[in-house]
Amino acid sequence: IEEVFAASIARRTHKIDFISCLEHSARQFVIRRPGDRTEVVSGYPWHGVSGRQTFVSLPGITLEQGHKEDCIDALDTLVREMRDGMFTGNASAAVAADAPLWFFWTLQQLEREVGGKQIWKAYGPAMKDILESYRRGVGGRVALHDNGLVWAAADDIPMTWMNAVIDGRPVTPRNGYQVEVNALWYNAVCYALELAGKHADKAFVKAWESLPARTQASFVELFRLPEGYLADFVGTDGPDKSTRPNMIVACGLDYKMLDEELQLEVIRTVRQHLLTPKGLRTLSPRNLLYKGSLEGGSPAERDFAGKNGSAWPWLLQFYVKACFDIDRDVFLPQAREILANFDEDIQSYGIGSICELYDADPPYASRGAISQAWSVGAVLNIHSMIRERTQEEARESKTAGKAAKAVKPVAKSIAKKAAVKKTATDNMPKKTAAKTAIAKEAAEKKSAAKKSAEKKPTEKKPAATKAATKKTKTGK
């Protein structure tokens, strides 16, 4: 009992500022169930548990507060229930093509806390099973094609996070190769290969090592548009050119298929069309389907606007990471501004938390669930990225300062030696100065004697010597 009490006290947060309020809110999403189950409630007051949102939320709502055990318990709950190499329920690729791939992204964040060895030991079998399931195909809806890309399609079931349905039909039909699904697929395969290579799983490496290059080549070929950004999906009718935020995921993962030039084009497009102070719009305002507000209207109209305009905070973490990866510390002021934009929200709508989504048009009114797990997790994740970059900037500045200080003593030493040399005689001890004066006087006397000797008349040679000299000159 004492241990439970101590653990409970340790988990308490003091709501004294913006971040501490969000940390307190984050604790409320993690639920302990009977039977050693740990789940993540997607949002309050009406959302339940979602596999996709669990994976996306976990790093921000657990790891950023130092509660890695909660993250591990939630993952273990889902892994224990896997069947035939796949998660069950709404975490299955059969109904959510991207959900199992977010599992790999979550593990990448967890690795920073526990190390790659522990990740591969605990979750390597599940990772390999999931990849094999995609290779075999899932539920007749998800398949890995020969070009290395994942195809997901279902007539009446939206297979991605844009899953609103009106009258039994998806609001945003995206059957085909979805941009974020395939970005996550590439990231998952590369991450599994990295861990397998480090921990001597030669069989897995041999079976999968040729796939990433094929996936990357196909992705760039199919998704890159002449306009510079990425298609939202590529279906039977070709690429869909709607400007949507899903392409930013391809720039915000650890393993990317895009070169720096294409990443910049994607970031520029997102910044120009989709970025708001509260999140990324789900559609460009230039699109005829765009809806800037959820105000009024029927539930169907609000569902339509939610995926055709409304701004979602959870996407911002991938935009911020993508910008940091390209601009590094130069992006810090903008990242701080993005974080500060949510400060006022904890005093309205969902007190002390971040809501599900916002209107895409000013004044960006709060909408949806008053407290959403992946919104809170994303903002806390952004805060963590800013903190890490700030610390790195401080270390670099400190290192540069030490280097500058190291140069100054060298310059001073050189100047000092020159000054010492110049004033050496003045600074000599008296005995040394006296010895120098005596030596100087002796040298002067020696020089005077030499000059005196040179002034004496030259001694005459004997006559025989003169004759010999003359004979030598004439040669006779």
Predicted features, each with a name:
Residues I1-K417, K422, K473-K476:
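Acidic, mature catalytic/reactive cores of soluble proteins
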Residues K398-K476:
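Intrinsically disordered, polybasic Lys/Arg-rich low-complexity tracts
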